[in-house]
């Protein structure tokens, strides 16, 4: 199934590049930013668990590290995106596609994060104990990785997403994007855990208490993501900054406004209602529903960041759908079969 989705994605990207290059470029960039961000955030989540000395996580640390198996593919996709974008950017208004030097810098950032992630994964695979030699190396690498992620993805957000609308400036935009990545990684982990809980072989790996812990984290990031979103809008209003309203007006009026409301409902409203009570965090079906809703909302979020600036106007059609399916298929294939150095949570059991 993943291979079929990848084939559809290639058809959509190549066909879209020939028929509607703006739409193909928009779809490729939005899906890249989301899935590369989730893959990196999975490793970051494992690093946070290691730095804090968490003992409740069970196999979640290994699951997060396995997300990192998509990072080499993401780097390759970025290289293709940079080359194709430079060709297709002729169809985009001048100044709305990053310059070559900016793309080189972004590629260097992705390469650095990939190197740190693989080194951290290797250190944990050699010895997960903090007091051993490899564990001490991981204690050094983990904080460096966290700092590099915060700075690196802030730059990537500024260059690849906010830079598409030069009239809009937000110093909070980078934090909003890298927190959104963590929100998506938690949703993907929660979805995986919920699916494991419904399988006889995986029920021991995802007991109700572990689902409850994941649900609480997902609920907290639901509130944080919404807070950061509102925090970027509020200063424009109370600071009376009319020159920055164009970015918001484009996304709050037809034809984009309906998608913005759907994004808020899927990213805040539905998860808030489902995860507010104890039952929603412990029942696999409810937790999985909230997780899928969050992932869909983040896909809409990245699309709304990119599409109004590059593709012009909706409706979204077969190009966007096929590229999204292809990207999801590539992510699933890498995570499911990728050569991660971390133990396989499905075969090594609970930590």
What does each model-identified segment do?
Residues 165-169, 241, 279-284, 305-319:
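Extracellular/periplasmic helix-loop-helix junctions in multi-pass membrane proteins
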Residues 1-39, 43, 331-351:
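N-terminal regions that are enriched for targeting/export leaders
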Residues 37-48, 75-81, 106-118, 179-194, ...:
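Hydrophobic cores of alpha-helical transmembrane segments in multi-pass inner/ER membrane proteins
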Residues 227, 271, 302, 343:
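Hydrophobic, well-ordered secondary-structure elements that form the walls
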């Amino acid at each position: 199934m993943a291979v079929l989705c990848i084939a559809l994605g290639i058809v959509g990207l190549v066909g879209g590049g020939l028929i509607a290059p703006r739409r193909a470029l928009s779809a490729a960039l939005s899906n890249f930013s989301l899935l590369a961000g989730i893959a990196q955030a999975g490793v970051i989540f494992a690093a946070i668990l290691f730095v804090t000395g968490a003992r409740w996580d069970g196999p979640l640390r290994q699951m997060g590290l396995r997300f990192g198996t998509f990072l080499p593919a993401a780097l390759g996709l970025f290289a293709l995106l940079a080359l194709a974008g430079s060709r297709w950017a002729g169809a985009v208004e001048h100044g709305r596609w990053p310059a070559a030097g900016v793309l080189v810098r972004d590629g260097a950032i992705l390469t650095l994060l990939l190197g740190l992630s693989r080194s951290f994964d290797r250190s944990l695979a050699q010895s997960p104990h903090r007091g051993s030699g490899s564990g001490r190396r991981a204690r050094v690498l983990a904080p460096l990785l966290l700092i590099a992620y915060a700075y690196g993805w802030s730059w990537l957000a500024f260059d690849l997403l906010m830079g598409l609308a030069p009239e809009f400036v937000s110093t909070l935009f980078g934090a909003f994007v890298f927190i959104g990545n963590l929100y998506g990684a938690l949703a993907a982990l929660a979805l995986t855990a919920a699916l494991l809980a419904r399988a006889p072989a995986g029920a021991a790996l995802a007991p109700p208490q572990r689902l409850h812990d994941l649900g609480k984290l997902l609920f907290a990031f639901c509130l944080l993501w919404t807070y950061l979103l509102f925090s970027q809008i509020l200063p424009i209003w109370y600071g009376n900054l009319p020159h920055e309203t164009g970015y918001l007006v484009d996304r709050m009026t037809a034809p984009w406004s309906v998608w913005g409301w759907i994004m808020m409902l899927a990213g805040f409203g539905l998860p808030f209602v489902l995860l507010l009570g104890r039952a929603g965090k412990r029942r696999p079906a409810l937790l999985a529903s909230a997780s899928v809703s969050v992932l869909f909302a983040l896909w809409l979020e990245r699309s709304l960041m990119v599409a109004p600036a590059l593709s012009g106007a909706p409706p979204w059609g077969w190009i966007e759908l096929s590229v999204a399916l292809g990207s999801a298929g590539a992510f699933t294939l890498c995570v499911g079969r990728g050569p991660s150095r971390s133990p396989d949570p499905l075969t090594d059991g609970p930590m």
